[in-house]
Every structure is written in C-alpha cells, then in structure tokens.
Amino acid sequence: MVKHYLKVCLKMTSAHVVVQLFSLALGPLVFYIILGSRTGWYIMSAALSVAYAIWVYSTAYKIAGKDIKSYSQHKAYIAKGLVIAVPTLLITLILTLLYDFSFYHQFTDYDMQMRFEFIVRNVFMGWNFSFEGFRSAADGTVRMLYWVLCYAMMPVFSFLGYWAGMNRYEFGYNFFSKLVYKTPAKTDKENKSLK
C-alpha cells in the first residue's frame, strides 16, 4: 500500500518536474519577442500555467483510471487526489523556506553566501518557473498570486483530475490526454473496420 502511494506521488512530482523543465526550456524561446515587457511575462506564465494544469489533471485522471479497475488492489477514494500532491507541496515548501533564508541570512564567508544564494534561488525559480511571470521583483518581494499558484495549482488540479477519473467523467480528458500522452496510431485494419 505504501509502495503504491510512493509510486503515484512520484508520478505527480514527475509531472511537476516535466512541466517545469518544459517551461524552462521552451517558454522563453517561444515568448522571446514579448518578454521584454512585464505583460509578456504575464502572458507566458498564463500559458505555462494552463499547460501545467492540463498535465497535472491528465496525470491524476490516469492514476484514478487504474485505481478503479476491479482487479486493482488499490481502491480509489476522493481524498487521494489531494494526498498524491503532498510530496510536491512539501518540496515546494522546503524550497520556499530555503529561498527566504537565502535573502535574510548573512554568512560569515561572503563567497559561501554568494554560492548558496545562487544555487537556492535558481533551484527555486526553476522549480516554479511556470509561474515566474507573476512573481513581483528580484528584491525578494513576491505577489500573493504567485504563492497561490505555487501552492494551489497542484492539489486543485490533481483533485479534480482524480475525481473525474474516479467517476469516469471525460470532461476534456480526450483532448487533454492527446496533448500529454502519446496515443498509438490506428492501423489500416482498424481504419477499415470503422468504415
């Protein structure tokens, strides 16, 4: 049972990491022309936040789809959609505390402080890059919307996706799953049988 929870939590954390890496790699390239303005960062973060929501929803939907099978020993329950987001939220909380610590703690060794700040701030920004456009300034002050997105997107959309998968609601799943998961191409035999 614990092994199953660790496995599905790892899937959700992997979904978070994949979207952030995708956002970090392609987001600035796609939106390079408009990133010179603050509005450009908002547009990029809004688009990447939608992609993040779709990916998390689809992953949770797929997990629930496996849990509701009659032969599965893992039973689906509605709160599992929230539980599977907990490890990702804990990592986000730890990185947030380290990020805050890097701004307000002074080391005796200046080089050590600079290395620590560089590593912590870049890891934190990479971990939450999809929402980076909603962060206020480089001086450490951060808008409330940024924190809401960092801490609410994963549990809300994993809950909705798991709930929809548990009840077999296909609201947008066929569309979203084509964006997230590779679907096998139909063979000529299948195409002829459909006609």
Describe every region a protein language model picked out.
Residues W55-K62, T141-N174:
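Transmembrane alpha-helical segments in integral membrane proteins
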Residues F118-F157:
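Hydrophobic alpha-helical transmembrane segments
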Residues G40-V50, A79-V83, R121, R143-A152:
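Alpha-helical transmembrane segments of polytopic membrane proteins
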Residues A79-V120:
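Hydrophobic alpha-helical membrane-insertion segments
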Residues M1-I63:
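Transmembrane alpha-helical insertion/packing segments
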Residues R168-K195:
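Short, highly charged, low-complexity non-transmembrane loops/tails of multi-pass membrane proteins
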Residues V18, F22-I34, W55-A60, I91-Y99, ...:
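Alpha-helical membrane-inserting segments
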Residues I54-K80, I84, F101:
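Membrane-helix interface/capping segments
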